[in-house]
Amino acid sequence: MNLCRECYGIIGEGVVAEKCEACCNAFDRVEEFAEEIVKKMSEYEFETFNVGSRVWGSLKALQEYLSLKGIEYEIKQRFNTKLARAIEEKTGSKRTLNPDITVLFDLETFTFELQIRPVFIYGRYLKRVRNISQTRWLCGYCNGEGCEVCNFTGKKYVSSVEELIAMPAVRLFKARDAKLHGAGREDVDARMLGTGRPFVLEVIEPRKRFVDLKELEEAINSQKWVAVRDLEYTDAEKVREVKTERHRKTYRAKVVFEEKVERERLIEALESLKGEIRQRTPMRVSHRRADRVRVRRLYDARLIHHTGRVAVVEFEAEAGLYIKELVSGDNGRTRPSLAEKVGVNARVDRLDVIAVS
């Protein structure tokens, strides 16, 4: 078998020749490949990189054939090392694990692709208006295609917290897209006030990595509907932390009763409501949540204002407690409920989240 010097050194038999029947002269073309790769990499800001390669087709078949003869033809590691060294020399960047850019080289077709590590940004957001969703919500009738129901927007709601935060980030980072990971979510018709809700923004395929986050914060906050604060760079692990941590939340609800309720009776009901709450999946979300009973704690319930049939109440609760159903009882699916304790039908007219601790 005619082999280049690299493959001859790996296989240990054959003839050193100009044309390699094993790697098709991939080793001899490393500098050429590196030039092409570095040209593409220059479109992105990066400090670190890594190289991986794929073996399949005829090269894989050759490996299997040589293996039957007791010869281990491991080309990937040696090729990756040579290509990485060439890229290091041309860019001054370092090869590391968890890099900004990963080069995936196909040793069968001599093509490559770049995998760009996302940028992760932690912060807190405030939602100043009602009736926008936390994340993009496609129209259920056309699945995002656009129809008369959604006025050909493809969306159920006019906008979302995710879009209003992502759009400035995509522009500044010159990214393909951005995705919001929130610490829970408020109802579409609820505001998120106070110090805001923790979130991580995942910026996908950014061409710029080192954006001044103060500039990003100002760009987002120039809009009327959403604001952010305390932005800082983080990593992918923060997404898991934000999504799994059990945050205690405080809500302010405007409650409307079917008939007048005495103030003392209402205060007593709120006091007795504290403690363990058993909630079967609310009817309003049963189409997208598993139907089961969840046990959550209500830590505090305070009367802020009361006039006849209307009250303003603050609830401090464990994450996952549905406040609207805590008030109404949801036809007995939530027990105890404020309506049950007072003995009068009740509903939440307006709801704000005022703290996520």
From Swiss-Prot:
Its EC number is: 5.4.99.25
For whether the record's keyword set contains Flavoprotein, the answer is no
Catalytic residues (UniProt): D187 (nucleophile)
Which key words tag this protein in UniProt? Isomerase, RNA-binding, tRNA processing
Q: Which GO terms describe its molecular function?
A: tRNA binding; tRNA pseudouridine(55) synthase activity
Q: What does this protein do?
A: Responsible for synthesis of pseudouridine from uracil-54 and uracil-55 in the psi GC loop of transfer RNAs.
Annotated protein name in UniProt: tRNA pseudouridine synthase Pus10
What is the organism field in this record? Answer: Archaeoglobus fulgidus (strain ATCC 49558 / DSM 4304 / JCM 9628 / NBRC 100126 / VC-16)
**This protein's encoding gene:** pus10
